[in-house]
């Protein structure tokens, strides 16, 4: 199978691609802007594998939760490849590849959103729960002390010092595993139907709401 998989939901850009004979994977850490390099890296991947977008059997896209800007860049890029050639897309929750590498039975994955708030998802007996966006206080009210709190960044785990914590390492290999399993199970959709998991409003939307509430 020929495929291209991308996740731009965090400061670690994950990519994986295959020409049906071999595959390449890449993890680029601590990126502030995905837009500046994503198209370039994708072209390099496809050139290396000697395939074109029209050759792809499917695409994979991390739909979040995470960086609003990063998700817009990633999903618009995937749509731009999918739509001209009618290539099906496998969407996946960006927390699921992270969960794949965790050995604990019960844990929660957290990723910081705006100040004092986190995206989070519990995995009890490794079964995923609902993806939520809450304040630190609200999260702690709902979490049992026995659960392990996991995050990709040490500075985010500081807010959960009264819990057992675990530092995650984003992996394009685990991302590929999740997406290939989903594709084989028929979990695909059209690029037209690809939607992000935003959960929170952007700063611009918050400011807009604030200005309009003062007018009324």
Predicted region positions:
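Short, well-ordered amphipathic alpha-helical segments that serve as non-catalytic structural scaffolds
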Residues: 34-49, 95
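Phosphate/pyrophosphate-binding loops at sites that engage ATP/ADP/AMP, CoA/4′-phosphopantetheine
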Residues: 42-58, 142-147
């Amino acid at each position: 199978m020929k495929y291209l998989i991308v996740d731009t939901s965090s400061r670690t850009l994950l990519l994986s691609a295959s020409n049906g004979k071999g595959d390449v994977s890449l993890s680029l850490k601590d990126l502030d802007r995905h837009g500046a390099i994503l198209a370039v890296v994708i072209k390099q991947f496809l050139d290396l594998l000697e395939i074109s977008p029209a050759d792809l059997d499917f695409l994979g896209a991390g739909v979040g939760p995470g960086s609003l800007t990063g998700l817009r860049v990633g999903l618009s890029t995937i749509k731009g490849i999918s739509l001209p050639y009618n290539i099906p897309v496998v969407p996946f929750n960006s927390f699921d590849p992270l969960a794949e590498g965790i050995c604990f039975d019960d844990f929660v994955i957290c990723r910081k959103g705006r100040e004092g708030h986190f995206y989070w998802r519990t995995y009890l007996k490794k079964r995923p729960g609902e993806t939520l966006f809450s304040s630190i206080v609200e999260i702690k009210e709902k979490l049992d002390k026995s659960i392990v709190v996991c995050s990709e960044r040490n500075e985010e785990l500081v807010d959960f010092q009264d819990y057992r914590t675990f530092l995650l390492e984003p992996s394009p290999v685990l991302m590929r595993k999740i997406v290939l399993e989903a594709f084989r199970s028929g979990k695909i959709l059209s690029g037209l139907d690809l939607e992000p998991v935003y959960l929170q409003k952007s700063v611009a939307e918050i400011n807009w709401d604030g200005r309009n509430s003062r007018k009324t």
